[in-house]
Regions:
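A short, N-terminal "cap"/entry segment at the start of jelly-roll beta-barrel domains
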Residues: 2-78, 165-199
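Conserved short histidine dyad/triad with adjacent acidic residue
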Residues: 65-70, 81-97
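A short hydrophobic beta-strand segment most commonly corresponding to one strand
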Residues: 82, 103-105, 128-130, 144-163
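Glycine- and acidic-residue-biased ligand/ion/polar-headgroup-sensing regions
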Residues: 88-89, 100-111, 117
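Short beta-strand His + acidic residue motifs that chelate non-heme Fe in jelly-roll/DSBH
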Residues: 93-96, 113-114, 130, 136-143, ...
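A generic "binding-loop/recognition-motif" signal
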Residues: 99, 118, 134-135, 155
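Short acidic-glycine-tyrosine-enriched beta hairpin
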Residues: 117-133
Length: 199
Protein backbone atom coordinates (compact mmCIF):
# COMPACT_ATOMS: atom_id res chain seq x y z
CA UNK A 1 0.00 0.00 0.00
CA UNK A 2 1.36 3.45 -0.90
CA UNK A 3 1.64 6.23 1.65
CA UNK A 4 -1.09 8.16 -0.18
CA UNK A 5 -3.49 5.21 -0.09
CA UNK A 6 -2.87 4.75 3.62
CA UNK A 7 -3.44 8.44 4.36
CA UNK A 8 0.18 8.92 5.47
CA UNK A 9 2.34 11.73 4.20
CA UNK A 10 3.73 11.11 0.71
CA UNK A 11 7.49 10.73 0.34
CA UNK A 12 9.23 14.06 0.90
CA UNK A 13 6.24 15.69 2.64
CA UNK A 14 5.59 16.17 6.30
CA UNK A 15 2.35 15.05 7.92
CA UNK A 16 0.98 18.62 8.11
CA UNK A 17 1.16 19.07 4.32
CA UNK A 18 -1.24 16.22 3.57
CA UNK A 19 -4.72 17.48 2.71
CA UNK A 20 -7.88 15.44 2.99
CA UNK A 21 -7.81 14.30 -0.64
CA UNK A 22 -6.63 10.78 0.16
CA UNK A 23 -8.91 10.47 3.20
CA UNK A 24 -12.17 11.76 1.77
CA UNK A 25 -14.80 9.15 0.95
CA UNK A 26 -15.89 9.26 -2.71
CA UNK A 27 -18.01 7.32 -5.18
CA UNK A 28 -15.66 6.74 -8.11
CA UNK A 29 -17.87 4.48 -10.22
CA UNK A 30 -21.44 3.35 -9.62
CA UNK A 31 -22.31 -0.26 -10.27
CA UNK A 32 -24.05 -0.81 -13.60
CA UNK A 33 -25.57 -4.28 -13.55
CA UNK A 34 -28.76 -5.89 -14.79
CA UNK A 35 -30.78 -6.21 -17.96
CA UNK A 36 -29.88 -3.62 -20.59
CA UNK A 37 -33.52 -2.58 -21.04
CA UNK A 38 -33.88 -1.97 -17.30
CA UNK A 39 -30.63 0.00 -17.08
CA UNK A 40 -31.70 2.09 -20.08
CA UNK A 41 -35.10 2.75 -18.48
CA UNK A 42 -33.48 3.79 -15.19
CA UNK A 43 -31.14 6.13 -17.02
CA UNK A 44 -34.12 7.87 -18.59
CA UNK A 45 -35.69 8.38 -15.16
CA UNK A 46 -32.67 10.03 -13.58
CA UNK A 47 -32.81 13.78 -12.91
CA UNK A 48 -31.59 16.10 -15.65
CA UNK A 49 -31.60 19.35 -13.69
CA UNK A 50 -29.75 19.88 -10.43
CA UNK A 51 -29.85 22.91 -8.16
CA UNK A 52 -26.66 24.03 -6.51
CA UNK A 53 -28.85 25.08 -3.55
CA UNK A 54 -29.37 21.38 -2.75
CA UNK A 55 -25.69 20.91 -1.91
CA UNK A 56 -23.81 22.42 1.04
CA UNK A 57 -20.47 24.14 0.69
CA UNK A 58 -17.42 22.42 2.18
CA UNK A 59 -13.96 23.73 2.90
CA UNK A 60 -12.87 27.20 3.88
CA UNK A 61 -11.68 29.49 5.24
CA UNK A 62 -10.40 30.93 1.91
CA UNK A 63 -11.81 28.48 -0.65
CA UNK A 64 -15.22 26.80 -0.55
CA UNK A 65 -16.51 23.99 -2.81
CA UNK A 66 -19.85 22.30 -3.48
CA UNK A 67 -20.05 19.20 -5.69
CA UNK A 68 -23.11 19.65 -7.90
CA UNK A 69 -22.80 16.71 -10.32
CA UNK A 70 -20.70 13.59 -9.77
CA UNK A 71 -21.15 9.81 -9.91
CA UNK A 72 -22.24 9.79 -6.27
CA UNK A 73 -25.31 11.95 -6.99
CA UNK A 74 -26.76 9.45 -9.48
CA UNK A 75 -26.66 12.06 -12.21
CA UNK A 76 -26.57 9.55 -15.06
CA UNK A 77 -22.93 10.19 -15.87
CA UNK A 78 -19.73 8.56 -14.72
CA UNK A 79 -17.38 10.44 -17.02
CA UNK A 80 -17.19 13.90 -15.46
CA UNK A 81 -18.01 15.93 -12.39
CA UNK A 82 -18.75 19.57 -11.83
CA UNK A 83 -18.59 21.75 -8.77
CA UNK A 84 -18.93 25.38 -7.76
CA UNK A 85 -15.87 27.00 -6.19
CA UNK A 86 -15.95 30.27 -4.24
CA UNK A 87 -12.84 32.20 -3.21
CA UNK A 88 -12.92 34.76 -0.40
CA UNK A 89 -11.69 38.25 -1.37
CA UNK A 90 -7.89 38.00 -1.36
CA UNK A 91 -8.11 34.23 -0.91
CA UNK A 92 -6.54 31.32 -2.73
CA UNK A 93 -6.64 27.54 -2.89
CA UNK A 94 -4.07 24.78 -2.78
CA UNK A 95 -1.23 24.40 -5.28
CA UNK A 96 -1.65 20.95 -6.78
CA UNK A 97 -1.57 18.80 -9.90
CA UNK A 98 -3.73 15.97 -11.20
CA UNK A 99 -3.79 13.78 -14.27
CA UNK A 100 -7.22 14.85 -15.50
CA UNK A 101 -7.91 18.04 -17.41
CA UNK A 102 -10.25 20.69 -15.98
CA UNK A 103 -12.24 23.65 -17.30
CA UNK A 104 -13.13 26.64 -15.10
CA UNK A 105 -15.89 29.00 -16.21
CA UNK A 106 -15.58 32.22 -14.22
CA UNK A 107 -19.06 33.20 -13.03
CA UNK A 108 -18.12 36.16 -10.88
CA UNK A 109 -15.06 38.14 -9.84
CA UNK A 110 -11.53 38.43 -11.11
CA UNK A 111 -8.28 36.75 -10.27
CA UNK A 112 -5.45 34.76 -11.71
CA UNK A 113 -3.99 31.29 -11.92
CA UNK A 114 -0.40 30.14 -11.75
CA UNK A 115 0.16 27.20 -14.14
CA UNK A 116 3.60 25.62 -13.96
CA UNK A 117 5.00 28.98 -12.84
CA UNK A 118 3.19 31.08 -15.48
CA UNK A 119 0.68 33.81 -14.53
CA UNK A 120 -2.76 33.84 -16.23
CA UNK A 121 -5.33 36.56 -15.42
CA UNK A 122 -9.06 35.81 -15.56
CA UNK A 123 -12.37 37.62 -14.96
CA UNK A 124 -16.10 36.88 -15.06
CA UNK A 125 -17.06 35.41 -18.44
CA UNK A 126 -13.62 33.86 -19.08
CA UNK A 127 -12.89 30.17 -19.40
CA UNK A 128 -9.65 28.82 -17.92
CA UNK A 129 -8.27 25.42 -18.89
CA UNK A 130 -5.86 23.32 -16.82
CA UNK A 131 -4.12 20.59 -18.79
CA UNK A 132 -3.23 17.18 -17.32
CA UNK A 133 -0.26 17.21 -14.96
CA UNK A 134 -0.09 21.01 -14.69
CA UNK A 135 0.84 22.29 -11.22
CA UNK A 136 -1.71 25.04 -10.68
CA UNK A 137 -3.22 27.34 -8.08
CA UNK A 138 -6.19 29.75 -8.17
CA UNK A 139 -6.15 33.24 -6.61
CA UNK A 140 -8.84 35.86 -6.08
CA UNK A 141 -7.16 39.16 -7.03
CA UNK A 142 -9.83 41.39 -5.48
CA UNK A 143 -9.56 42.54 -1.87
CA UNK A 144 -13.29 43.34 -1.79
CA UNK A 145 -15.23 40.93 -4.03
CA UNK A 146 -15.47 37.13 -3.95
CA UNK A 147 -14.73 35.02 -7.02
CA UNK A 148 -17.05 32.20 -8.10
CA UNK A 149 -16.48 29.59 -10.80
CA UNK A 150 -18.05 26.48 -12.30
CA UNK A 151 -15.48 23.70 -12.55
CA UNK A 152 -15.92 20.76 -14.93
CA UNK A 153 -13.48 17.85 -14.68
CA UNK A 154 -13.04 14.50 -16.34
CA UNK A 155 -11.72 13.13 -13.04
CA UNK A 156 -14.18 10.18 -12.72
CA UNK A 157 -13.14 8.90 -16.16
CA UNK A 158 -9.45 9.20 -15.29
CA UNK A 159 -9.96 7.46 -11.95
CA UNK A 160 -11.87 4.63 -13.66
CA UNK A 161 -8.88 4.19 -16.01
CA UNK A 162 -6.51 4.06 -13.04
CA UNK A 163 -5.03 7.49 -13.79
CA UNK A 164 -5.73 8.86 -10.35
CA UNK A 165 -2.43 10.33 -9.22
CA UNK A 166 -2.89 13.73 -7.59
CA UNK A 167 -0.23 15.63 -5.70
CA UNK A 168 -0.67 18.55 -3.33
CA UNK A 169 2.36 20.84 -3.48
CA UNK A 170 1.06 23.47 -1.05
CA UNK A 171 -2.09 22.64 0.98
CA UNK A 172 -5.19 24.81 1.31
CA UNK A 173 -4.64 27.76 3.67
CA UNK A 174 -5.97 27.16 7.17
CA UNK A 175 -6.14 30.80 8.24
CA UNK A 176 -8.90 33.15 7.05
CA UNK A 177 -8.11 36.30 5.12
CA UNK A 178 -8.08 39.15 7.69
CA UNK A 179 -11.43 40.92 7.67
CA UNK A 180 -13.20 37.93 6.07
CA UNK A 181 -13.31 35.56 9.04
CA UNK A 182 -17.13 35.32 8.85
CA UNK A 183 -17.38 34.96 5.07
CA UNK A 184 -20.54 33.17 3.93
CA UNK A 185 -20.12 31.47 0.53
CA UNK A 186 -23.87 30.88 0.22
CA UNK A 187 -24.44 34.63 -0.23
CA UNK A 188 -22.21 34.82 -3.31
CA UNK A 189 -24.13 35.20 -6.55
CA UNK A 190 -27.47 35.70 -4.83
CA UNK A 191 -29.91 38.60 -4.83
CA UNK A 192 -29.42 39.04 -1.08
CA UNK A 193 -25.74 39.83 -1.61
CA UNK A 194 -26.53 42.34 -4.35
CA UNK A 195 -29.15 43.99 -2.14
CA UNK A 196 -26.66 44.25 0.72
CA UNK A 197 -24.12 45.90 -1.57
CA UNK A 198 -26.62 48.49 -2.80
CA UNK A 199 -27.37 49.73 0.74
Amino acid sequence: MTSEASGAAPDGADESSVDNYSRKRRVFVREVAGAYSEIYRQLGERPRVFSERDVAFKGGPQHFVKGVINPGRDAGTQLFECHIDVYVPGGHGQRHAHMNSAVFYILEGEGYDIHDGRHHDWKAGDVCIVEPGCVHQHFNASAHEPARMLVIKSKPLFIFAGLMHQRTVVPEPTNPVPGWEDFDPTAVGTDSRREAQSR
